[in-house]
UniProtKB/Swiss-Prot annotation:
InterPro entries: Aldolase_TIM, ThiamineP_synth_sf, ThiamineP_synth_TenI, TMP_synthase. The gene is thiE. Belongs to the thiamine-phosphate synthase family. One of its GO terms (biological process) is thiamine diphosphate biosynthetic process. This is Thiamine-phosphate synthase. PANTHER family: THIAMINE BIOSYNTHETIC BIFUNCTIONAL ENZYME, THIAMINE-PHOSPHATE PYROPHOSPHORYLASE. GO terms for molecular function: magnesium ion binding; thiamine-phosphate diphosphorylase activity. 2-[(2R,5Z)-2-carboxy-4-methylthiazol-5(2H)-ylidene]ethyl phosphate binds at residues 134-136, 165, 185-186. Keywords: Magnesium, Metal-binding, Thiamine biosynthesis, Transferase.
Length: 205
């Protein structure tokens, strides 16, 4: 399955400002988002399931892959395209056994060692970061910058997306590294015009 990682949206309901998540995701896709990750922290399993199911109605309609952050059970329950796992989440090999070979598994990495390990273990793509300082993640160990991104990108052969503080003023510098895509939260969700915000992050619009 060929996946377009160019513009990777991660959901965060804290940025909704009273708007419906389904509508926000739809507008983002219409603006150019190519893949959506549903990320929910500190909510019940039932609530996460309901949110993910709601988003999947939109992604299915537009034939855009939907990735679930961390929770394999939710991914299975809604038949998501795959999961995204952090360094402290379930091991990739176990996740692959559970989900099977046809599902997408992405791994967050912050250095060359983690990247090579994830690639060797069969990750489908990597989320590389944190590139720039960001308010979305509080447990950031290290900002790697463009140089750190380039080093990791040059060490691997699988697709990757950059994450962390990427916005319309710096995304072109990130893409110059040859990375397959950028992953954003607030650069789209914190804007009033979601569709325009997404479109402003496309290199070939």
């Amino acid at each position: 399955m060929e996946i377009n990682y160019e513009l990777y949206l991660i959901t965060d309901r804290r940025f909704l400002k009273g708007r419906q998540l389904k509508k926000v995701v739809e507008d983002a896709i219409l603006g150019g988002v190519t893949i959506v990750q549903v990320r929910e922290k500190d909510v019940s399993t039932r609530e996460f399931y309901n949110v993910a199911k709601e988003v999947k109605e939109v992604t299915d309609y537009y034939k855009v892959p939907i990735i679930i952050n961390d929770r394999l059970d939710i991914a299975q329950a809604i038949d998501a395209s795959g999961v995204h796992l952090g360094q402290k989440d379930m091991h990739l090999n176990i996740a692959r056994e559970i989900l099977g070979k046809d599902k997408i598994i992405g791994i967050s990495v912050g250095n060359v060692k983690e990247a090579l390990e994830a690639q060797n273990n069969g990750a489908d793509y990597l989320g590389i970061g944190t590139i720039f300082p960001t308010g979305s993640k509080k447990d950031v160990d290290a900002i790697i910058g463009i140089d750190g991104l380039s080093k990791i990108k040059d060490s691997i052969s699988i697709p990757s997306v950059a994450i962390g503080g990427i916005n319309k003023t710096n995304f072109k510098d990130v893409l110059k590294t040859g990375i397959e895509g950028i992953s954003v939260i607030s650069a789209i969700l914190d804007e009033d015009d979601i569709k325009l915000a997404a479109n402003n992050l496309l290199i070939n619009k």
